[in-house]
Every structure is written in structure tokens, then in C-alpha cells.
Regions:
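Non-transmembrane, aqueous-exposed alpha-helical and coiled segments at domain scale
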Residues: 1-127
Length: 127
């Protein structure tokens, strides 16, 4: 039977899930199940710094397969930039290594405009 490791954050993000996932994902299938590009994580390998927002941190490891799941909201321009940046750094990002769920959500420009408008309307009642 295969080993399964699940990393769950309970602090509204920014608690180090990406770093922990990277440490346990040397040869595995890494899944990003939820979230968007607003948060990010940075991993260091051999003195090289990788900053990621949408892709699982394990994408920088050569023997992993990565999945972006149905609960992820994807800004396509950010994803494309992230992939191009990693490829320029020598990371192989290909359809064989990166699977994107057809049920993942796509962030469109009007979503960003609506989000900005809603935040402005909240005024001092923000969280």
C-alpha cells in the first residue's frame, strides 16, 4: 500500500505548508487542492531560490508529478509567467509532470475588478 501524507493548514495560510510539502515530496505525486496565486512560498535547492504561487513546490524536484486540483483558482497569466520562469531556471514543466484539473477555476479580469470593488465598499469593515 502506498504512503499518503496530507498537509493541512488551519491558520488562514502563511503557516509554512509549502516548505513542509517540499521536504516530504522528494519522489511523489504532489497535489495543490485549494487556493489561488495570492499566497506564495519559496524553496531553496542548492543555493537556487524558487518562488511559487500556483504550482506545488515539488515541481522543482525532477521525480515528481504535480497536480493542480479542482479547488484552485488559477490566474492564467500568473501561471504562464511562473511556468516560463521555472523553465528558464532549468525546471522541466510539461504535461507529463503537471496535470491541471479541468474543474479548476479560472480567474478572469472581471473577477479581479469585482474583488477590488468589494474591498473598497467594505471600507473600515474589512477583516
Amino acid at each position: 500500500m502506498a504512503n499518503v501524507t496530507v498537509i493541512v493548514g488551519t491558520q488562514w495560510g502563511n503557516e509554512g505548508k509549502g516548505r513542509i510539502a517540499h521536504q516530504v515530496s522528494k519522489e511523489c505525486i504532489a497535489v495543490r487542492g485549494t487556493g489561488s496565486s495570492k499566497a506564495g512560498h519559496t524553496v531553496m535547492i542548492g543555493g537556487q531560490k524558487f518562488t511559487l504561487h500556483l504550482l506545488p513546490a515539488a515541481i522543482v524536484l525532477p521525480n515528481t508529478q504535480c497536480i493542480i486540483g479542482p479547488g484552485v483558482a488559477i490566474d492564467l497569466s500568473i501561471l504562464a509567467t511562473e511556468i516560463k520562469t521555472l523553465q528558464a531556471m532549468g525546471v522541466k514543466v510539461s504535461p507529463e509532470r503537471l496535470i491541471i484539473s479541468p474543474r479548476a477555476h479560472i480567474i478572469l479580469p472581471y473577477h479581479i475588478s469585482m474583488d477590488k470593488m468589494h474591498e473598497k465598499l467594505k471600507g473600515s469593515n474589512k477583516l
